[in-house]
Amino acid sequence: MTLVDVRTPDPKRFIPGATGDWEVIVGMEVHAQVLSNSKLFSGASTEFGKPQNSNVSLVDAAMPGMLPVINEECVRQAVRTGLGLKAQINKRSLFDRKNYFYPDLPQGYQISQFKDPIVGEGKIVISLGPDRQGQFEDIEIGIERLHLEQDAGKSLHDQHATMSYVDLNRSGVALMEIVSKPDMRSSDEAKAYMTKLRSIVRYLGTCDGNMDEGSMRADVNVSVRRPGEGFGTRCEIKNVNSIRFIGQAIEYEARRQIGILEDGGTIEQETRLFDPNKGETRSMRSKEDAHDYRYFPDPDLLPLEFDDAFVSALAVDLPELPDDKKERFVRELGLSIYDASVLVSEKAIADYFEAVAAGRDGKTAANWVINDLLGALNRTGKDIEQTPVSPAQLGAIIDLIKAGTISGKIAKDLFEIVLTEGGDPAEIVDARGMKQVTDTGAIEKAVDEIIAANPDQVEKVKAKPTLAAWFVGQVMKATGGKANPQAVQALVKAKLGIEE
């Protein structure tokens, strides 16, 4: 593969060193587990968390005479992902044997794709920001390829004092290896890339994106150079399993390499591991090249071929993806780019928002979902799937505000009650006497009392009419937030002689 530099050096991304500025170059190989009930070449289950060695077929265990049979659903999922990445779909691809020895690789080789992958070049657009001016920066990250391959098993070193065990539940599970071009220039860009890629495969339903379960993990390639120079020697950081760790690994590795080069040393091409406890990378082994794996076409598998109709049928059924959904939210609902970006960041959040916004004002729904619901979930360490407030309940609260039944302040209190106790919002309002006061006589009485008790403030308002807001706040406080805010404001201004 010939590396092409498509980015113009950007001073705001330079890393200052003792002898001048440096630029970090990042590319990623992301292993995404295909969402499928069975493995790539066998009928064994892919269910996570099952007892050790319970999801293993004779094919997965590499028993003599067992032959691989391609899982068509895994092929479909790879093509769907390629379409979602706006990539070239190769209607003819080959499976190869990647030869290496490891205890949890029973075949002695991994079935992968080398020269002829199922998906070719594509792209992902990431967005950084907003900056201090509220602007976003869109950056296109190239996709080099996507290929299908088997996962290996798992070596267990903590089960016995002197022996290691092997769990083959993952052996043969289908992976999509999604290889980016070296187009990223900071840890923030790399984190945004991984976040966007995970969002896309979740929208597509081709990978669950659960990094804590190993369903998505990244090999991060890092090198540094002086701005304007050619690519430096890269080091690969293996199996980074969280977006936060990706950022930490890149920042540490870039600093490590800069330190070596500034001291007159050279960077050795190698594979490294990231230690999240120490926040540093350490050497694992020298980096292999393709010829070290002795790739050759797998003689047990025919070339994988399909036609345009196969691809077209999958393309027609693709769901609306994050970028398209964000554009629609901005165009049709009048949301800001920031709010739309937050709402489409996860499919579950977007689905929740659309359920709340159906038949209601989009901006109001967005404010409640982003500021109140997501804020509450962040405080309690829950995600959107665990929310105790359903879209119907949140929508009902918004409806009560619009109908004038409750004020905005009371709505906040009502939301907290629904969040902690559940229940129907309208019934809670009735049972707890939370309806706002719309009786102008009662409101006028409260306004008169506040004005009479604060003659000094009345004089100040005459000089500075904007201070009338203080009286509005006092009346709202006196009525327990139940008074209609618009009615209070109108009466305060009328009583104080402030013209509209």
Curated annotation (Swiss-Prot):
Pfam families: GatB_N, GatB_Yqey. Keywords: ATP-binding, Ligase, Nucleotide-binding, Protein biosynthesis. The keyword ATP-binding applies. InterPro entries: Asn/Gln-tRNA_amidoTrfase_suB/E, Asn/Gln-tRNA_Trfase_suB/E_cat, Asn/Gln_amidotransferase, Asn/Gln_tRNA_amidoTrase-B-like, GatB, GatB_C_1, GatB_Yqey_C_2, Gln-tRNA_amidoTrfase_suB_CS. One of its GO terms (molecular function) is glutaminyl-tRNA synthase (glutamine-hydrolyzing) activity. The keyword Kinase does not apply. It comes from the Bacteria. Its EC number is 6.3.5.-. It catalyses: L-glutamyl-tRNA(Gln) + L-glutamine + ATP + H2O = L-glutaminyl-tRNA(Gln) + L-glutamate + ADP + phosphate + H(+); L-aspartyl-tRNA(Asn) + L-glutamine + ATP + H2O = L-asparaginyl-tRNA(Asn) + L-glutamate + ADP + phosphate + 2 H(+). Coiled coil: none annotated. It is an enzyme of class 6 (ligase). One of its GO terms (biological process) is translation. HAMAP family: GatB. Belongs to the GatB/GatE family. GatB subfamily. Heterotrimer of A, B and C subunits. PANTHER family: GLUTAMYL-TRNA GLN AMIDOTRANSFERASE SUBUNIT B MITOCHONDRIAL AND PROKARYOTIC PET112-RELATED, GLUTAMYL-TRNA(GLN) AMIDOTRANSFERASE SUBUNIT B, MITOCHONDRIAL. Allows the formation of correctly charged Asn-tRNA(Asn) or Gln-tRNA(Gln) through the transamidation of misacylated Asp-tRNA(Asn) or Glu-tRNA(Gln) in organisms which lack either or both of asparaginyl-tRNA or glutaminyl-tRNA synthetases. The reaction takes place in the presence of glutamine and ATP through an activated phospho-Asp-tRNA(Asn) or phospho-Glu-tRNA(Gln). This is Aspartyl/glutamyl-tRNA(Asn/Gln) amidotransferase subunit B. The gene is gatB.
